[in-house]
Amino acid sequence: MKKQNLIEMEGIVTESLPNAMFRVSLDNGCQVLAHISGKIRRNYIRILPGDKVKVELSPYDLTKGRITYRLRMKTTNG
């Protein structure tokens, strides 16, 4: 169930940290410490540095977030 007062932004994973934590660089230039949501963990979705992800931020602490979705990278055939 999605909460109403969350801020959702897109960013790129810059660093992988222990305990399923990641440093994410958001599109507006801010750095955020983010952990993986339960659905991503349960479905064994791998997140690597360089992946584009959606992050939910709490309005109370904008330095921490939760990775809710890994966006697909566009592949070019050529």
From Swiss-Prot:
Pfam family, one: eIF-1a
Keyword Coiled coil among UniProt keywords: no
Keywords of the record: Chloroplast, Initiation factor, Plastid, Protein biosynthesis, RNA-binding, rRNA-binding
SMART domains (UniProt xref): S1
Domain of life: Eukaryota
InterPro entries according to UniProt: NA-bd_OB-fold (IPR012340), RNA-binding_domain_S1_IF1 (IPR006196), S1_domain (IPR003029), TIF_IF1 (IPR004368)
A single GO cellular-component term on record: cytosol
SUPFAM superfamilies, alphabetized: Nucleic acid-binding proteins
Residue ranges constituting the S1-like domain according to the UniProt record: 1-72
Family designation: Belongs to the IF-1 family.
Protein name, entry field: Translation initiation factor IF-1, chloroplastic
Organism phylogeny: Eukaryota, Viridiplantae, Streptophyta, Coleochaetophyceae, Coleochaetales
